[in-house]
């Protein structure tokens, strides 16, 4: 029996395919990963280093554990070129959350969100050395507990752009961003926050 080509095409699609996010800098190319982060969703290969992570019907609830002496952190073992990441978050008492991007050895960049502000930065890339973090944007913005918000991070070439809820955007540029990126991660300081609808796309610059 022959299988129709249309069926084969559908079977080749990733599970839980997400809609390509709206962007300012890049065009979404190929979907690399989609994880609803709920108890019903097919889980991506997250590596939890710190904290408590529990999948619920609403999303993955994340808490910092006092015994860890470190914020909750979970990462994907994923090498990245130019990319787009989109996800939703809800603060449920957390002091802060972040989306963090590394290279093979060190932190590279992050989007940090508190109940009162969000920050976009290139991270300190050598810890005890001369390098220092560079803050591209530190904007006052209220994120009320219990309300959902949407984040899109684009990194293409030497530029990163972050947009929250389709209206608040900031960008920065650094030569470091041209190097291979890896291990995108979510973090949470305090108790607690919930994440859902995480998607990762390869990207190409707008023509």
What feature does the model see in each segment?
Residues 179-207:
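Ligand-recognition surfaces built from glycine- and aromatic
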Residues 37, 85-87, 148-162:
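Short tryptophan-centered beta-strand motifs in secreted/extracellular beta-sheet-rich domains
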Residues 52-70:
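Short carbohydrate-recognition loop motifs
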Residues 65-126:
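Secretory/extracellular carbohydrate-interaction modules
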Residues 71-78, 137-143, 184-185:
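Beta-strand-rich interaction surfaces with strong enrichment in secreted/lumenal proteins
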Residues 128-150:
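Short, aromatic/His-centered strand-loop micro-motif at the edge of beta-sheets
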Residues 163-183:
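Short, solvent-exposed beta-strand-to-loop segments that form ligand-recognition rims
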Residues 19-48, 207:
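Extracellular carbohydrate-recognition regions
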């Amino acid at each position: 029996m022959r299988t129709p080509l249309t069926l084969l095409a559908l079977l080749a699609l990733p599970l839980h395919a997400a809609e390509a996010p709206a962007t300012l800098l890049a065009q979404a190319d190929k979907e690399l990963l989609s994880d609803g982060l709920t108890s019903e969703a097919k889980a991506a290969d997250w590596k939890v280093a710190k904290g408590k992570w529990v999948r619920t019907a609403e999303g993955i609830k994340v808490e910092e554990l006092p015994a860890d002496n470190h914020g909750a952190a979970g990462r994907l073992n994923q090498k990245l070129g130019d990319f787009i990441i989109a996800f939703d978050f809800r603060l449920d008492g957390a002091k802060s959350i972040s989306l963090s991007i590394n290279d093979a050895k060190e932190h590279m960049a992050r989007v940090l969100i508190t109940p009162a502000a969000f920050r976009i930065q290139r991270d300190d890339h050598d810890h005890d050395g001369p390098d220092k973090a560079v803050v591209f944007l530190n904007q006052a913005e209220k994120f009320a507990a219990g309300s959902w918000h949407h984040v899109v991070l684009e990194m293409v070439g030497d530029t990163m752009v972050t947009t929250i809820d389709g209206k608040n955007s900031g960008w920065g540029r650094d030569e470091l961003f041209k190097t291979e990126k890896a291990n995108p991660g979510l973090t949470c300081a305090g108790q607690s926050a919930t994440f859902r609808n995480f998607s990762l796309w390869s990207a190409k610059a707008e023509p």
